[in-house]
Design a protein with these regions (language model features):
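Alpha-helical substrate-recognition element adjacent to the catalytic core
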Residues: 1-145
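Conserved acidic, metal-coordinating active-site core of Asp-based
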Residues: 129, 133-167
Length: 167
């Protein structure tokens, strides 16, 4: 069978909002997500910093200031709260079945600037052959320490190439 890859961003593609808006931003003190994202933009500009690294850094700093411990499980659990667009959960099986009828092996991939651990907590995580998304480095207690991988807009093209080459 011929292999076909469907490649998705996550935020505002499969879900109506940025994943951090499903609880974690409120917990660190942002009732209005725009205030957080504006702060991230300011930090990125002031420090000539990649915006993805800036949001990851800011999540760490804000959580520390509020005494909130963000670890793998915290991110995974917040992923369970992410709302998906109507029809998204059914889409994957439908398109795989459609492809199979036509002799195609359909695979689904995520390439996202969002957080991999949160995507893993969603109800659709199992649908993906691979999830390429931003990740944190964790300490011995699984608490986040620092951004480990930040997938920005230009890096996404690198992952398209990797998928095309069979990873």
């Amino acid at each position: 069978m011929t292999k076909v890859a469907f490649i998705y961003d996550f935020d505002k593609t499969l879900s109506p909002f940025d994943m951090q808006e499903y609880g974690s931003l409120k917990e660190i003190g942002y009732q209005k997500p725009k205030v957080f994202w504006d702060k991230v933009d300011r930090i990125a500009k002031e420090h000539n910093m990649d915006r993805i690294l800036a949001y990851m850094y800011q999540m760490i700093e804000e959580a520390k200031e509020k005494g909130i411990s963000i670890n793998r499980q915290y991110l995974f659990d917040h992923g369970k709260n992410i709302q998906l667009f109507d029809g998204v959960p059914a889409w994957f099986g439908s398109i795989k079945a459609y492809g199979k009828k036509r002799g195609l092996d359909v695979e689904h991939y995520i390439v996202s600037s969002g957080l991999k651990q949160m995507i893993l907590g969603t109800s659709i995580a199992h649908e993906f052959a691979h999830i390429f998304a931003s990740e944190f480095m964790y300490d011995e207690n699984d608490n986040i320490k620092w951004p480990a991988l930040a997938i920005n807009y230009t890096m996404k093209t690198q992952y398209l190439f990797r998928i095309n080459k069979g990873l």
